[in-house]
Design a protein with these regions (language model features):
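Flavin-dependent oxidoreductases
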Residues: 15, 175-180, 184-270, 274-285, ...
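Conserved Rossmann-like nucleotide-cofactor binding loop
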Residues: 12, 35, 209
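N-terminal Rossmann-like FAD-binding beta1-loop-alpha1 element of flavoenzymes
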Residues: 2-29
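C-terminal catalytic lobe of FAD-dependent flavoproteins
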Residues: 254, 263-264, 280-399
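Short beta-strand to alpha-helix junction loop
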Residues: 62-65, 90-99, 139-157, 167, ...
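Glycine-rich FAD pyrophosphate-binding loop
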Residues: 22-42
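Helical element adjacent to the flavin cofactor pocket in flavoenzyme catalytic cores
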Residues: 138-200
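Dinucleotide-binding Rossmann-like beta1-alpha1 core, especially the glycine-rich loop
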Residues: 46-126, 135, 256-257
Length: 399
């Protein structure tokens, strides 16, 4: 029997696994896909948000700011590509400046440091390609960009190093209370073999399917809506078109279409925001991609959309409460939700991991792992090495 079983190996599930591995705990992660980071975590804006948009007092606000704070140390220890490039929320001539002032108030209440509103003259010096209609912007210097793939893999690999077991190609079919534990029935999607797991504590980090698993064990039903966002990724030749992450004023559907550099030197434009019934609907559409160019032009001019090298879509897990749903389920002792993790979920993942681990510590007698290894060497990319460095590597590893 496992002490803890985590459902879902996205960035949240993997971050929780890594945080739990700091303790002497028999834990596993169950993931239906063939690798980690194959759901929501693989198709998003790759942004570490400052934390100014979330409503003060919500979990989104608290955990975004905390997660942002943790990123420098995590990037160093786990070798995660991360850069604090800063973000700008721009206001145009036909918009009300009061929207920026409200964001500034919210961000200040949330504890976001160094926020300020800057005027067009300073803005254009920072970002020459901003639209001619942009009049001012909220500047958040703590905003950043990250690689969600490397971030998730870093958490998962470090968790594995410290003893957490990952079961991939393993689809959860049912979860049942079994005395003081839970019985998790699964199907191995590659072999079609069935396997049953027993765990004292179950952590539900299943993205758009988190409501399905919650509703198997609880009368307190959740409803997760899959909110599709389409993106265009541009060639590295376009990667310097902007240097900051450029947001538009947010709406009830999200933070709007952004234009941002990536940590790999490309330019990313997106997302759209359309609620869909199909939780597997990650297809792109002509109308969605066409709308990106028009909408992005409101904040950034001359975005070189002819240099698009690929397009993709991802699904955000929107819960009806409009906040993260994190905590032990009242009528299902030992079942912990990490549900409704939409934006700013990537930014908040390290802090969500801390919060969930604290909940587990209230359910199980956890002791520190004296052998915990807190660092990890990232994936080597030969294309980033000099000729001398590549030759040295070849000599060291001729195989």
């Amino acid at each position: 029997m496992y002490d803890v079983a985590i459902i879902g190996a996205g960035v949240v599930g993997s971050a929780i696994a890594r945080e739990l591995s700091k303790y002497q705990v028999n834990a596993c992660v169950i993931e239906r896909e063939e690798d980690v980071c194959n759901g929501t975590s693989k198709a998003n804006s790759a942004i570490i948000h400052g934390g100014f948009d979330a409503t003060p007092g919500t979990l989104k606000a608290k955990l975004n700011v905390r997660g942002n704070f943790l990123m420098d140390e995590l990037a160093r220890d786990l070798d995660i590509p991360f850069k604090r490039n800063g973000s700008l929320v721009v206001c145009t001539k036909d918009q009300d400046r009061s929207g920026l002032e409200k964001l500034l108030e919210k961000g200040t209440a949330n504890g976001v440091p160094d926020l300020r509103i800057i005027e067009r003259e300073e803005l254009i010096a920072m970002e020459p390609n901003l639209s001619d209609d942009v009049t001012c912007a909220l500047f958040a210097p703590t905003g950043g960009i990250v690689c969600p793939f490397h971030m998730t893999m870093a958490f998962a690999e470090n968790a594995c190093t410290n003893g957490v077991k990952f079961f991939l190609n393993t689809q959860v079919d049912t979860i049942e209370k079994n005395g003081d534990s839970y019985r998790i029935s699964t199907l191995h999607t590659d072999t079609k073999n069935k396997e049953t797991f027993e765990a004292k504590v179950v952590i539900n980090a299943a993205g758009v399917y988190a409501d399905v698993f919650n509703n198997m064990v609880s009368e307190n039903k959740l409803h997760i809506t899959a909110r599709k966002g389409e993106y265009c990724l541009l060639d590295k030749d376009a990667g310097t078109h902007v240097s900051h992450t450029i947001f538009q004023l947010p709406s009830k559907m999200g933070k709007g279409v952004l234009v941002t550099p990536t940590v790999h030197g490309n330019l990313l434009v997106g997302p759209t925001a359309v609620d869909v019934d199909d939780k597997e609907a990650v297809n792109t559409t002509a109308s969605g991609l066409d709308s990106l160019a028009a909408t992005a032009a409101r904040s950034v001019k001359n975005v070189p959309m002819r240099q698009v090298i690929t397009s993709f879509a991802g699904l955000r897990a929107h819960e009806d409460s409009n906040d993260f749903v994190i905590g032990e389920v009242k009528d299902a002792k030992g079942f912990i939700n990490a549900a409704g993790i939409e934006s700013p979920g990537l930014s908040s993942a390290p802090a969500i991991a801390e919060m969930v681990t604290d909940i587990v510590k209230g359910l199980l007698p956890l002791e520190k792992n004296p052998d915990f290894v807190g660092t990890r060497k990232g994936i080597l990319r030969p294309d980033t090495l000099s000729l001398e460095e590549r030759n040295k590597l070849i000599k060291e590893h001729p195989e």
